[in-house]
Swiss-Prot record:
Role of this protein: Succinyl-CoA synthetase functions in the citric acid cycle (TCA), coupling the hydrolysis of succinyl-CoA to the synthesis of either ATP or GTP and thus represents the only step of substrate-level phosphorylation in the TCA. The beta subunit provides nucleotide specificity of the enzyme and binds the substrate succinate, while the binding sites for coenzyme A and phosphate are found in the alpha subunit.
EC number(s) on file: 6.2.1.5
Pathway: Carbohydrate metabolism; tricarboxylic acid cycle; succinate from succinyl-CoA (ligase route): step 1/1
Requisite cofactors: Mg(2+)
Gene: sucC
ATP-grasp domain location: 9-244
Chain residues that bind Mg(2+): N199, D213
Name this polypeptide is given: Succinate--CoA ligase [ADP-forming] subunit beta
One GO MF term: succinate-CoA ligase (ADP-forming) activity
Subunit-structure text: Heterotetramer of two alpha and two beta subunits.
Reaction it catalyzes: succinate + ATP + CoA = succinyl-CoA + ADP + phosphate; GTP + succinate + CoA = succinyl-CoA + GDP + phosphate
Keyword list, A-Z: ATP-binding, Ligase, Magnesium, Metal-binding, Nucleotide-binding, Tricarboxylic acid cycle
A biological process term (GO) from this entry: succinyl-CoA metabolic process
């Protein structure tokens, strides 16, 4: 789960990390009031969306007076911001973050991720801040330095100092960086994070470190024990179909194809998408209905899949383990009748009572194409999507 920059900076402040003073604003009036409460004569207004690349897309602006901040608010609030990390529709801008301007001498990068290979939280730093870190890793990997955190000790000051030396920091800056490093390592574990990023971490002209930006991604599997973070979730930034699926305990990810997929089991779902691609088709989604493929869940899954107007056919691929295929077949028939599916539906059943399940589908009178194998199902779905 992503947090907005202003939310991330609230958490940064809880951990005594250096952030500028700012206000989240939902109207032009609030933005105008914000600059009156902030110090300085230059401020920064930022669109709050769950995507990077805001600056290049025009979503970040230096403002010098009330007229400029009002104009920026009127331009963006209620609109959608398109960046290189969004789709063509962009993300809705419902909030601006207005903060004090900063005098910047250097821009650095500081981030942390959970590295599954080493089973450690790994920090990364670079002297190339303020740019896409993926480009730095690809083009100049020697400028990216890493530090793994021992889960027994947490982040240690000496590790922070070592990274500070590699960044070319001097004097009191080293002490400041070590503090930031230790507190971020603590935050990462205590808040159940999946990613933590400051890009850029700046050295001001006064020689101090400042977290100019802040990005937090929370591990969604841990939200049950992070109620305060859960309350920060912004549904407007999520695909509405994905949000609806989550409310029904369905795992759904929207894609850009035209063959809807309904599968039980994440591994089988990925395999189904692969075989659709292998036979020349394009999956419209990833959807795992889980172990209990009941009529109700199948019906909701159909509704979510068919809410995508690009879907021209649906492939249902169910492996009956504990759940019997004959019961699944009855659930599919009931769901198709209830939802009113108007595109071809290809169903492949395998496992417990699969022959009986296929017989029930064949005798149902419902417009369902029964497939005997996964390959057959994929071929049939691709043909159906092409109108053949």
């Amino acid at each position: 789960m992503n947090l907005h920059e202003y939310q991330a900076k609230q958490i940064f402040a809880e951990y005594q990390l250096p952030v500028g003073k700012g206000y989240a604003c939902k109207s032009a009036d609030e933005a105008a009031d914000a600059i009156k409460k902030l110090n300085g004569d230059v401020w920064v207004a930022k669109c709050q969306v769950h995507a990077g690349g805001r600056g290049k897309a025009g979503g970040v602006k230096l403002v010098r007076n009330e007229a400029e901040v009002r104009a920026f608010a009127d331009q963006w609030l209620g609109q959608r911001l398109v960046t290189f990390q969004t789709d063509v529709n962009g993300q809705p801008v419902n909030t601006l973050y207005v903060e004090e301007g900063s005098s910047i001498a250097r821009e650095l990068y500081l981030g942390a991720v959970l590295d599954r290979a080493s089973q450690r939280v790994v920090f990364m730093v670079s002297t190339e801040g303020g740019v896409n870190i993926e480009e730095v890793a690809e083009k100049t990997p020697h400028l990216l330095h890493k530090m793994a955190i021992d889960p027994l000790t947490g982040g240690m000051p000496y590790q922070g100092r070592e990274l500070a030396f590699k960044l070319g920091l001097k004097g009191d800056q080293i002490k400041q960086f070590a503090h930031i490093f230790v507190q971020m390592a603590k935050m990462f574990v205590e808040k159940d994070l999946a990613l933590l990023e400051v890009n850029p971490l700046v050295v001001t002209k006064e020689g101090n470190l400042l977290c100019l930006d802040a990005k937090i991604v929370v591990d969604s599997n841990a939200l049950y024990r992070q109620p305060a973070l859960k309350a920060m979730q912004d549904p407007s930034q999520e695909d509405p179909r994905e949000a609806l699926a989550e409310s029904h305990q369905l795992n759904y990810v929207a894609l850009e194809g035209n063959i809807g997929c309904m599968v039980n089991g994440a591994g089988l779902a990925m395999g189904t998408m692969d075989i659709i691609k292998l036979h020349g088709g394009q999956p419209a989604n990833f959807l795992d209905v889980g172990g209990g493929a009941t009529k109700e869940r199948v019906a909701e899954a159909f509704k979510i899949i068919l809410s995508d107007s690009a879907v021209k056919a649906v492939l249902v691929n169910i492996f009956g383990g504990i759940v019997r295929c004959d019961l699944i077949a009855e659930g599919i028939i009931a769901a198709v009748n209830e939802v009113g599916v108007n595109v071809p539906v290809v169903v492949r059943l395998e496992g417990n009572n699969a022959p009986l399940g296929r017989e029930i589908l064949a005798n149902s009178g419902v417009n369902i194409i029964a497939a005997n194998t996964l390959t057959d199902a994929a071929i049939q779905a691709v043909k159906a999507a092409e109108g053949k």
